[in-house]
Amino acid sequence: SGFTHFDEKGKAIMVDVTEKQDTVREATATGKITVNEEVFRAVKEGTAGKGDVLGVATTAGIMGAKRTSDLIPMCHILPITKCKVEFEMVESELAIYCNCTVRVTGKTGVEMEALTGASVALLTVYDMCKAMDKKMEIGEIYLVRKSGGKSGLINNGYKKERKEGEK
């Protein structure tokens, strides 16, 4: 169906959603940060020098989702009605996974808000732990699921099942 953010002359535009119906829309994005053993332990035990890493990262992820339209030029400003940021720690991978779920009743979806929320949360983990690990890697950020609107349900699922009980 082509790119929607360009006019017939190739100039960037914000898509006109005026005539679209308000519907409940929800999106979940995920990503992960891999860390060394020292960081993993400090985050899990709450002993990182800068404080409660996952608590601060949760707040940052919510703030990131709310500020998406300030960061992504063609994103509409949306009245988000729900934003939930959750972490899962998988010791066998020395990885901290982040899920961000965003909901809105509106004319356009919240995929970018969910992706931004997960990204900002993981960047915050990086920022708070960079003194302990110079080789952390953020990756595998993608849309897991979205619902509502013209596209209906899109379920990409998780790329890899995480081991049960490792949270």
Annotate each PLM feature:
Residues 1-54, 59-167:
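C-terminal binding/interaction regions
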